[in-house]
Amino acid sequence: MENTKTNASSSGMSSSSSFSVSYAEEMLLADEVSKINSMSILGPNQLKLCTQLVLSNGAAPVVLSLVSKEKKSILSRILPKIGQRLYVHHSAIYLLYMPNILKSSSGSITLKLFDEATEELVDVDTDHDATQACIFAGRYPRSILAKDAAKGHDLKLVVHAVASTKANSAVGVLYPIWEDELSRKQILERGADFLKFPIAETEPVRDLLNAGKLTDFVLDRTRLGVGSKNDPSPVLLEPRAKITGKAKTVFIPEGPSVPNTTISGMAPTVRIDAGSPKGLGVPKGFTYESFIKDEILPDH
């Protein structure tokens, strides 16, 4: 069964165009779409992580097509067979953002969806804190014509980053994850804002407080001391000459009968003790030889 439709202007047949539709073609379209959806690489509800986008400070906006190369290749093969009555749906779009800059810096990220065929924009987030990791989740509420997607006029993700850090330095990394499903039916959904799920910072991945490793590190690079653990308390220091021993002084009373005696060539020194209670005399029987031997040279 085949029908023909003709469009004419008000002036008659001055301008016309016609095309034919076929029930067989519609069935072929349904069969082809079913085959596409049954393929593991292009199955429905299959999310795709195709790339990562490094966002540079102040650089030109990054633009990414949200129709994968695999889908475009399939479209280029099947569109001549089934005509142009096929659509691409983006029923799930996730954008994982991981910052490269510290919390002490500042910056913002702008994310938008752009339908190149209709030149329409949908805001994902126009002022996201560039220091905060998060996941954006949402969808595009309209279908993209397969013929437009095959030509590259598809849904685009546009991202721009500005921060207080060095120009053209990496502000963060964006991981787009999406679903691009082929269907012969259009979608008509209410537009909804993208959801944003912040990601908390994690604990350190390594424990620094390992006493054994720190001790080994110090021992390898430090000269160890062997002195006392505690220094002495400050005290008054009095410099004095050190006396090794006390000299012995011999008091020898001198009388008129005391001879000058020399023993072994050594003459003893005689000190006159005028204050002796016994006067200037000497005891009876006193001799220098016995005094020297007994008092001065007891070891000889």
UniProtKB/Swiss-Prot annotation:
GO terms for biological process: transport of virus in host, cell to cell. Keywords: Host cell junction, Transport, Viral movement protein. It is found in: Host cell junction, Host plasmodesma. It comes from the Viruses. GO terms for cellular component: host cell plasmodesma. Its main location: host cell. Transmembrane segments: none annotated. Transports viral genome to neighboring plant cells directly through plasmosdesmata, without any budding. The movement protein allows efficient cell to cell propagation, by bypassing the host cell wall barrier. Acts by forming a tubular structure at the host plasmodesmata, enlarging it enough to allow free passage of virion capsids. Belongs to the alfamovirus movement protein family. This is Movement protein. It comes from Alfalfa mosaic virus (strain YSMV). The lineage of its organism: Viruses, Riboviria, Orthornavirae, Kitrinoviricota, Alsuviricetes.
